[in-house]
Amino acid sequence: MTYTGVCDALRFPALEEVTGELNIKTSYVNGSFVSMLQEIYTPVLKKVGKLVLTTHNKSQESWCNNVLTNLDCFRALENVGVINIEYQLGLVSFKGLEKAIGGLTDDTSWVVGHNAYNPTFEQAKNGELEQN
């Protein structure tokens, strides 16, 4: 499932599982207009094959999402094969992924970069999920 769009909020109130990839582009550029996703709502999502949060266009920093500061929307997520979070310039807390991180087995399942906070796999496994 891939989302690339221009809405402020992405809501999946009944979504419990995505067997493949859940790929959410959190910003979208149309000409000079930049739209940023402000809210993700997935209160019962428990399982995802691969979780990807990135931007539609990485060529300019001003086109990357700077609104999302945490991943609390994924609090219910317990099982994920790969977590890939990139280009979220306001993101300072991965605490919402705490349950899912517990099930990750090696650093190849943790791809994080170009965010406001970028914990390593070891830091994430040790519970260092928020920027100090």
Question: Whereabouts are the PLM-identified features?
Answer:
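Concave beta-strand-loop units of leucine-rich repeat
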Residues: 1-132
